[in-house]
Each structure stands twice: as C-alpha cells, then as structure tokens.
C-alpha cells in the first residue's frame, strides 16, 4: 500500500513538521529550537543536470535543505503556514511567536505571549498553532488556554490577542476546524474541536466555548475530521471526528454529540490501560488516493497503523522507527505521506500494489505486516552551531545552519 522512499536524518528530536499547501516544501521544528526547511522532489523537476529524465513522477529524487536557523531559545513547539503559503509562524518554549518568510526564513515580525493570568507575570508556554482563516490564528497553551489573534494584511500578528478562552485544564494537544456551514459567506470555519487533558471541547469564534465533553479518563492526544460518509444512519453526511488516546484506542465522535464518544477502535491497546501504546498523531487519507474512509495513526512504539473507519479495524501496520514514537503525520499536496518522530522524517508513497490477493494477505498476516483489529535570545543567525537540548514538550514524555544538504531517494541512477 505504501513504500518508504527516503529517510531524512535530523540534528535533534522532532517536535513539529508542516508542509506548504501548494509547493514541495517541508519545514521541521526541533527540540534544539532549530527550524529548517527542505525542498522535496517535485513532479515538475523532470530532468537532471545532464538532461536525463528523473523518476520524480513517482516521488523519487533529492531532498535538499533550503535554509536553517535557530529560531527559538528553547524548543520549537509548533509551526503553521498561512492559508496561501505566503507566511509561516513558529511558537517556542521561550513564549515567543514569530512570523517569517517560508522561502528565506527571515523573521518579519514577532510577539510575546501575555501573562498567564492577571495574578501573575509568568507567561504561558505555547503548545500548538493553527491558522483558522486568512484573518485568524489560534494558539493553544500548556495551561489549557486558547488565544485568538488577528492577522494583518501582510500576515503579521496583532500583538494583543482578540480573545482568550480556557477550554481545557491541561495542555491543548490538537485543534481541528469544523467545516463551515452552508450559510457561510466566507467559506472559512468559525468553529473548531480541541483536545486537551482528558476532555474534548468545541469553541466558536464569536461565542466562545459551546460544548465540553465528559471526562474520558484517558488523555486525548490527536484528532482529525472525516467530513462525510461516517455519520449515524440517515445522517451519513454528518461529520465525524476521530481522536487518538493515550491507551491506544481511537475514538469516534459524531458532530453535534460532543458529550461523549460514540465508537471505539482498538489500534494499539493492551490488556490494561497501562499496556497500551499512545496514539500521538493522526491524518486522514486524502480522497484522491481512493482508499475509502481511512486514517493513518502514529503510535508511541514507532509504528504507523492504517485504520479502516468503516470496518472499524486496523488493516496494515508499517514501521517508522524501532525505538522512537511517531509525533507528526501529514500528506503533501502530491499525496505523499510524511511521517516524523525522534530524529528522522520519512517520505512514503503508494507502492502500486493496492490490492492484495488472498495468498498475499495470508503471507502478510504471517509476517506481521497486516494486523487485524482487536476486540474492543532571538537568534536567527544561520551560521550558528546547533546543540540538541532536552525537550520539555509534555507530548514527548514518552552542522551549521545555512549549509545546504541533500538526501537521495532510492532508485536513481
């Protein structure tokens, strides 16, 4: 179903990765505070220097470092692109949010987070960023706070947040926008689902927190939305949100019924809660691949589980790493899967063998490839040397900057 095209080594543990919406650009944020952008092989790059055609149409070629810098004094916790890809934002443990150019990495503007509350001068630590629309950026924090910032015409952040809500009692682990209603004139979301600690919440841009779930008695770590096709009977067009938990269970939530989960899929659970592996990252498989209603889940044991949401089962298991868990999953605009965790990023593409016959399925099960479901100082000097640091990111309990480097894909002459 998927084959690994390339493994990209990193200089420190990965905290976050993000892909340009329309260009083959991958940016990573590391525990050392370093941010680096790579150019992935592109279908348009059809000839090499000697004029020979390369195999980039299948996603093979060279990954090249475009720029690198120490963006934050502490770790880089999260990255986000603007909707059109013209601007990027980073947030670090230094409680600073920076707006910079994706092509050069040059900082255009920056802001510091306000104090956590009126009773203290201590600033909160950012945990996650999400650009909701061309005018709005959301920032979730370690304390469960959620700030709403206005974006100016050039993408710069207004220094003061427009609003602050506190939907969770613990750090915000994911933000998933809900599709705009049919009556929307802009087409951009006005509501979003967030997870933090052991609860799920829904927040409205204008009206604040509109729903909070019951205590799930398990950490909710990641989420994604399936817009149609999985809702209850006679409501198949209703959206469903898939949420990964700390004990290896993938839970499904019907839009509008936010008090509790409706379905459970055992992805990496054990006999007890302590035995399960955490589900730290999730991504919906693009419709263009024609796989049906599936998600790929990054697991704390370093595996990638491909989950069929209609059958409520794990169909295939791949391996990102033997030791480190998978902390980030994204599909690029060419529908290649990018998995990240530990000190490696991997690029995956369809192998061409989408349909296994019965004999192949038996062989896959015998080798363990297929697993059935179970029951239940602001330094932007590109020449600065980097030294990996220990991470303070709660989700990870479990050379020189400007020199270009590249990694070859296999299969080239």
UniProtKB/Swiss-Prot annotation:
Entry keywords, A to Z: Nucleus, Repeat, WD repeat
Annotated InterPro entries: WD40/YVTN_repeat-like_dom_sf, WD40_repeat_dom_sf, WD40_rpt, WDR55_POC1
Annotated spans, Disordered: 39-61, 353-413
Subcellular location per the Swiss-Prot or TrEMBL entry: Nucleus, Nucleolus
Disulfide bonds: none
GO terms under cellular component: nucleolus
Origin superkingdom: Eukaryota
Residues annotated as transmembrane: none
Main location: nucleus
Compositionally biased spans, kind Acidic residues: 353-365
Record has Nucleus as a keyword: yes
Keyword Nucleus: yes
Signal sequence coordinates: none
Segments annotated as WD repeats: 30-70, 71-110, 120-159, 220-263, 277-317, 321-358
Homology family: Belongs to the WD repeat WDR55 family.
PANTHER family per record: WD REPEAT-CONTAINING PROTEIN 55
Protein known as: WD repeat-containing protein JIP5
Organism: Podospora anserina (strain S / ATCC MYA-4624 / DSM 980 / FGSC 10383)
